[in-house]
Amino acid sequence: MGFYRNLVLVAASCTQALGLCPAPRCDSPDIRHEWGELSREDRLSYISAVQCMKDRPPELSVEEVPAVRSRYDDFTAVHINYTLQIHNSGIFLPWHRHFIWLWEKALREECGFTGTLPYWDWVMWPNLAASPLFDGTETSLSGDGEFNATEQPTELNPEPGLTITIPRGAGGGCVRTGPFKDWVINMGPFAFNESYEPALPDHAFDYNPRCLVRSLNDWVIQTYNNQTVVDTLLDSPDIVEFQNIMGGFPNPPIPIGPHAMGHRSLGPDMLDFFASPQDPAFWQHHGMVDRLWTVWQDADEPWRRFALNGSSTTWYKDDTPEVTLQTTVEFGILDEPRPLYELMSPTAGPYCYTYT
């Protein structure tokens, strides 16, 4: 399958999602666990598989995508390629569900991983540096970056007349502890404003090797990813409000969404709108996003399982179609195109997993 800069949206003929075709469900789903629930051996096994993906050669060619140097980079490149469709859109939730499943599948098939994709429960770890995910030990996802005195607070304006000052994080420099110390990332950085453009920037796949930077920010995770926020999210009466709260767009009851702020809590590279998969914690963060969507869907199966809302492009750009269950999305070299109705249940279609 080729690598394209444009997402193709076509109609699928099957009406399985409407109950007119069989929708088989698996009987014995794999269970995805929170990182803190894993044994030492299971954490080390997952870390080893991630490092394996970094060591394996890419399937994309350097001639086609100059920045790729590893199989891991293939996944980042695919995410970049579809960024202008898959964020703050009706595609966001199902596309990322499938993307992290493809990552889990690659870990198993290409790197001998026998476990399931762990997730990061934001609520459990209000002190990030003390958490088993980011304490910098050999069984963590590495720790904070070195202190960078030049990092400054950030001002956000999520709504007219509303300014939020985000205090700076604790680090701001290269990650030097844990299994991913001196981790090299090759793509980006991207300016956030580039997400509003109609096409990817010319530098999208330029080779730019540098260290992974983190700046752990407890204020962010405690303010925007706490139990109250999660409860509000799960109390959403419909997919419109669920997406608004999760993403903070377009009309959120809370000003910033836990998806974006989970990214922000780890610093600039995890916050990169296009290239965030380069931080190994990306997969655990999006595991939590998918877990909450799953819990919300399960709470009202008949009405929520196949609920979709939104445009097929980031920021609901003008003259782009609304998504339907027949909308087909692409994953580049990672997989064949998939209609959204195949991606709506973690225990049907290609999937067979659940969460603790």
Swiss-Prot record:
* Position of the signal peptide: 1-19
Ranges in coiled-coil conformation: none
Which pathway does the protein contribute to? Secondary metabolite biosynthesis
Q: What is its EC number?
A: 1.14.18.-
Q: Which GO terms describe its molecular function?
A: metal ion binding; oxidoreductase activity
Residues annotated as binding Cu cation A are 87, 96
Post-translational changes noted in the entry: Glycosylated.
Record localization: Endoplasmic reticulum lumen; Golgi apparatus lumen
Keyword presence, Metal-binding:
yes
Activity regulation reads: Activity is inhibited by the presence of dithiothreitol (DTT).
This protein's cofactor list reads: Cu(2+)
Per its UniProt record, what PANTHER family does this chain match? N-ACETYL-6-HYDROXYTRYPTOPHAN OXIDASE IVOB-RELATED, TYROSINASE FAMILY MEMBER
Family (UniProt): Belongs to the tyrosinase family.
From the Swiss-Prot or TrEMBL record, give the protein name.
Tyrosinase P
